[in-house]
Amino acid sequence: MRNRFKLPEHLTMGNFVSAGGAHASGTKDGGNDSGLAAYVASLIDRTLDWNDIKWLRTICGSMKIVVKGVMTAEDAAESVRQGVDGIWVSNHGARQLDTTPATIEVLPEVVAAVSGRCEIYLDGGICRGTDVFKALALGAKAVFIGRPVLWGLAHSVSKGLTVLLSSLH
């Protein structure tokens, strides 16, 4: 949002239309940015802490609890101490954070910190089968992909998805 991005007047951001106001068009009055970053930040509960995992456990019964977004050994160790069933190494696409490390780079330290006490999953930066192989070899139990699937579908629907999945084989 640093570049004061603004959609053309005839376009809207469909995911924000129900929120009303200027956020649907990606604009706001005043300030040096589009206002979208502030709007999205206002949706995040900053009071969340490690104690919330204990609370989740009380209402989830036998449902597995997986913490997503773990990128450090310290957070991995604390996740295990809190009793999670799995850790999902993810930088949430890193497209908004230009200094976030790649998930494959932090995976070995997360695996070492966990020492087999829970399962570890990974997403981010997975574009071909060798990426999947590396993540599994470094200790991930499973690897997830997101954006490449959407790219394949957007490019040529089922044929694009078939090509993408073939490249992961």
Q: What do these predicted ranges mean?
A:
Residues 68-70, 89-92, 123, 145-146:
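Generic beta-strand/beta-sheet core signal
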Residues 47, 66-73, 100, 118-132:
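Glycine-rich beta-to-alpha transition loops that act as phosphate-gripper elements at the mouths
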Residues 37, 91-101, 150-154:
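Glycine-rich, proline-tolerant flexible connector loops at the mouths of alpha/beta enzymes
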Residues 59-63, 80-94, 114-117, 139-143:
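Glycine-enriched alpha-helix->loop->beta-strand junction motifs that scaffold or abut catalytic
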Residues 12, 16-25, 43, 105-122, ...:
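Alpha/beta catalytic cores of nucleotide-metabolism and tRNA/nucleoside-modifying enzymes
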Residues 1-81, 93-96:
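Active-site entrance/lid segments in N-terminal catalytic domains of soluble metabolic enzymes
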Residues 48-54, 58, 101-114:
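Short loop-to-alpha-helix "cap/lid" segments that border enzyme active sites
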